[in-house]
Amino acid sequence: MSTPTRTVTLVDTTLRDGMSSVSHRFTPNDVAAIAAGLDRAGVRTIEVAHGIGLGASSIQYGFAAATDPEYVRAAVDAVDHADIAVLYVPGIATLAELRAAVEAGIRTVRVAVHCTEADCAQQPVEWAKDHGLTVMTFLMMSHKLDPEPLAEQAVKLESYGADVVYVVDSAGAMVPRHAGDRVAALRRAISAEIGFHAHNNLGVGIANALTAAENGATFIDGSLRGLGASAGNAQTEVLAAAFERAGWHTGVELFPLIDTAEQVVAPLMTEPQIVDETALVLGYAGVYSTFFHPTKRAAAKFGVPTRDILLELGRRGVIGGQEDMIVDVASELAGRTYDLPARAGI
């Protein structure tokens, strides 16, 4: 194999996005074991928190097994080299919760906003920079904007101080051309580093990540065993192997990654991470990945096929935070109304 001449940084989100695959039930001991394995493998940024991000442990998004600061401290204490990061979604997280995460030991924050709403990131990005954090920013549901308008949003994020701006395929709706075009547009528009976050609903998460790198992305997200919302993320250990085969230097060691995935993560999984019908249609319809489990529950409750609910949600252009629309659509498709207690039961 030839000596790699290009470099890409792998960021692992098993302990944040991957939380969605285990109903946010990783314990602090689980977090410590996984973080230690990632650190030994050379992963230098590890994202930790509730699956939706800081402050999301709730009846709306599901209760986690521990608090965000407990998770952060467990990870910080377990690593020797890696930075521990958290996800901050304006409207869910607060600056007080971010401050608590800083006190617990994070050195990186990832601020995530819908792809048309970069303005919402200004306050947390500026606060984080003032407090000495590395700031990565997410343009969620990036498939909903064409490349040039997406790049305009990236320019705003850079102006607030973002160190990295991510193209984020929150729905797993992109194919490689979509990923490449959007990253290339950002590369022309900003000087900040560019990242790419894939979901695997159409089975092309790894291909999308490789194409993103070819077009200028230098940070690539993954999760061990592909854990993550709906169909899951690009699989970290597969990314490491694929990038090495493609001639890229990642700085991580493949076999320690595989060992952590097989010996630590796999026994904690409650079900295989697969592209089932719901995950596939979710990506096809371009619906946010966190709609996965609520849509399945609504389909069972109202006796409506999940695909019909997701296709209608896609037609309505729903975004993250509009999960209440799932029940509205399921009820309409079922041709009956629902009362408030029934809705709360979803």
Curated annotation (Swiss-Prot):
InterPro entries on file: 2-IPM_HCS-like, 4OH_2_O-val_aldolase, Aldolase_TIM, DmpG_comm, DRE_TIM_HOA, PYR_CT
Organism in which the protein naturally occurs: Nocardia farcinica (strain IFM 10152)
Entry's family note: Belongs to the 4-hydroxy-2-oxovalerate aldolase family.
GO annotation, biological process: catabolic process; L-leucine biosynthetic process
The EC number(s) this enzyme carries: 4.1.3.39
Cited PROSITE patterns: PYR_CT (PS50991)
Protein name per its UniProtKB record: 4-hydroxy-2-oxovalerate aldolase 2
UniProt keyword terms in alphabetical order: Aromatic hydrocarbons catabolism, Lyase, Manganese, Metal-binding
Site note Transition state stabilizer, residues: 16
Reactions listed under catalytic activity: (S)-4-hydroxy-2-oxopentanoate = acetaldehyde + pyruvate
HAMAP family, per database record: HOA (MF_01656)
Residues annotated to bind Mn(2+): 17, 197, 199
Domain of life: Bacteria
Domain Pyruvate carboxyltransferase: 8-258
Binding site for substrate: 16-17, 170, 197, 288
MF-aspect GO terms: 2-isopropylmalate synthase activity; 4-hydroxy-2-oxovalerate aldolase activity; manganese ion binding
